[in-house]
Amino acid sequence: MLDSTNGTGVQGHVEDGWGKVADVFRANFEGTPGEVGAACCVYVDGRPVVDLRGGLADREANRPWNEDTIALVASTTKGATAICAHLLAQRGELDLDAPVVKYWPEFGAAGKEHIPVRWLLSHQAGLPIVDGPLTFEDACAWHPVIRSLEAQKPEWQPGTEHVYHSMTFGFLVGEVVRRITGRSLGTFFADEVAAPLGLSAWIGLPEAQEGRVARIGYAAPFTLEEMTAGMIETTGLDRDTVIAWMNAVWGPDSVQARAGQLGGAFDHTSGYMNTRAFRAAEFPFGNMFSDARSLARMYAATVSEVDGVRLLNPATVEKMTVVHTDKTKMNGLPPGLDVPANRSFYMSLGFWRACPPMPFVGPGSFGHPGSGGSVAFADPDAGVGFGYVTNLWSFRIGEPRASNLAAAVTACLGSRR
């Protein structure tokens, strides 16, 4: 049991040989940006070896981050959504090579009739953008977004390009799950993943859990200038090249900027993420609320048995982690302007694989990060499940808090061999 006296309030459990992770976790509170509140958990071979928490869940209210605190994990949600799809595939209820229209006939409009399910998971469906117009209330209601996706024409020939489907991923995969099971993605996750493992994790937060939620704060405004500065620092490229790349990827008319608006439903300056309406909705692309322990436990159960429960068998893990896209090129970039080598990432069926921006703990690792800093992953070879959550959101590219923790886990694993 740890009980910090350095003002960060770091508490928890660390087994012998895992002290480096605790050292990095404490140091994160003193770095730039310094943590407000956070938690980190590591499972190895189905049991926890690190379970840490510290800081404040709500800086304004001076509320401490305790054992029951949960936080928004943003796109780390996508990993949980993908696990749900692969559970159905493992059970023989979902064929990843079948066209989406087998399960969702209305999806076939506007030239989408041949898109296979796997392209929804690998971000190759050509549907990162919804023309709309949609409102936030439409997104919360689910079906208006589904109707828009049914009518949407792909931005390019499906299967030929990879672009991150930041918002639509959750609606696309979630609707397939709903058509097969008759349950929303959030309900399926609660029944088939969270309940068997005893997780404190929800996609669609029950009102009874509101008092546990950490309040989000920001290390700095989410600006193109901030992201550009981080890119210069982490790539070593000259400013003109970085500005050209960032404008192409994140400028106001770029594919990614339009994708993040979901047809006008999301205004990223409105502070909606701290509202009850956002928390209560089911957004399988990015509004799971969880503690670090649950993230680590969930991923651990994909590669090993956890208290008698294993979610996915080795054959399923092998199939779902095959790299489908090597993101060294990105749709919408000017000719000759590729993704810098140390920013490339590799996407399998719903998961990031180990890559330069997020090496995890080894070449076999798979998982998903989230905007603001959260991350969760597993490593089949090491038997690792890892989860990290924070309420101090930073959009700095190369943001080191989670990657430093993962590096410490890697070092501890190495010392055990």
Question: Where on the chain are the PLM-derived regions?
Answer:
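Short, conserved catalytic-motif segment at the N-terminal edge
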Residues: Q11-V73, D95, A151
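Active-site SXXK
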Residues: A22-R26, G46, I70-D97, V173-R178, ...
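Flexible glycine/proline-enriched surface loops and loop-helix/loop-strand junctions
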Residues: N66, Q152-G159, F169-L172, T275-P284
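Active-site helix/loop module of the DD-peptidase/beta-lactamase fold
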Residues: E67, L72-T76, Q90-G132, E150-A151, ...
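Active-site-proximal alpha-helical segments within enzyme catalytic domains
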Residues: H123, F169-V176, E282, G286-G308, ...
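Active-site Gly/Thr loop motif
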Residues: A220-S290, V322-D381
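Short, gly/Ser/Thr-rich active-site loops of penicillin-recognizing serine hydrolases
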Residues: S304-D307, T316, T321-P334, R396-R417
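Structured C-terminal helix/loop/strand segments within mature extracytoplasmic catalytic/sensor domains
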Residues: H368-R417
